Amino acid sequence: MSFADVSYDEAMRRARECVPTLLERAQKCEDARVLLPENEKLLHEAGLFRFHQPRRFGGMELPFQAIVDIVAELARGCPSTAWNVGNLGCHHWILGYYEPETQHEVWDANPDVLIASSIALAAGRGRIAKDGFVVSGRWPFSSGVDNSDWNMLAVTVYGDDGKTPVDWRLCIVPKTDYRVIDTWYAMGMVGTGSKDIEVKEIFVPERRALALKLCRGGPGHPGGKLNPGPLFRIPIVASAGHPLSATALGAAEGAFQHVVKSFKTRLGTYTGAKIADFQAVQIKIAEARCLIDSAIALMRDSAVAFQEFAQKNQVPDLETKLRFRAHNALAVRHARQAVEALWSCYGANAIYTRDPLQRFMRDLQAMSQHFSFNFDIAGAGYGTAVMGGTYVNPTM
């Protein structure tokens, strides 16, 4: 099925329509520890994995900010499912940077195909071989891997001495080439199914090994001529946090809506007083709202800016890229702090597993541990660059 004629507004309508069902199934998703097959089916039917797939392959090819808005909307219902939509959906976008032959190989067979990933460059080792690379490694946190037929694995390629890095590749490999190791017993984001992946001495042809240094912005990557639209001129590594951090926005929003709805009618267990009349509660609600609004503004500002740079055929400088990565990290921090504020005034009901607030809280805590959302790391990078220091990342 083609979704090439689906507009941004229609995609958002479809996402909103999915939220009640995702919320209803959120506990089942957590219990299963994977993207539920019925949720996958629901999202396939709505086309919501294909918002950034090139139109020539039947995708929506929506502006970059759609990945923030769609994922955040879905996360109001189930953050784990939304995380997988952002993660698996953005791989349709990244595949658009690969050689045309590889794009056709994957999408001609199945335009709905799901592609997992693990972006830990240090986890994969590669060496140069004739017409490609020989790759080995074990990668953690491959979200949605059980639902996927392919996997994009980050690999550091070493020179003849086996010690000197000479290249950084994102290798797309079929599921027949890797082993899934079930390590995913987590306290939050449980339904993402983010298991380990292992490969041993597999050959990856050049056309399936995307050079990340060619994807730092602009059309000069292998897929640039096939997909000339602005979406495919956005720097991959600099913007890679957006598909995932959007989940934090929606999780915080879902928690906020749940708490406000509860407080409008809830009475204190011991006093019988209306909770909504307590000034301390009112202040916490306002604090949470402002933190969520701040997080949304940070994320949308940088997402829109990435799209605008690309539309003008411009590439943001390193300082700007690092500032936008810091936006990601601070947005997730603000989202987590918002839910912490809600949690602090919600009372003992928050500890029941039947109450969605505890799952939103655990999910935000788990998300905050992601490398990309560590503000000390992201902030140090931007602070170094803006004050004239040297920041080295050959893939940025």
Task: Identify what each model region corresponds to.
Residues 142-183, 193:
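A short core secondary-structure module
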Residues 17, 251, 258, 287, ...:
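Charged, amphipathic alpha-helical oligomerization/scaffolding segments
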Residues 1-13, 17, 395-396:
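Basic/polar N-terminal segments that are highly enriched at the extreme N-terminus
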Residues 35-45, 50-149, 162-166:
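Glycine-rich flavin
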Residues 23, 27-31, 293-330, 343-351:
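C-terminal helix-coil-helix/basic helical segment that borders enzyme active sites and/or dimer interfaces
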Residues 128, 139, 154-157, 172-175, ...:
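Short, structured patches in soluble enzyme cores that scaffold and shape functional sites
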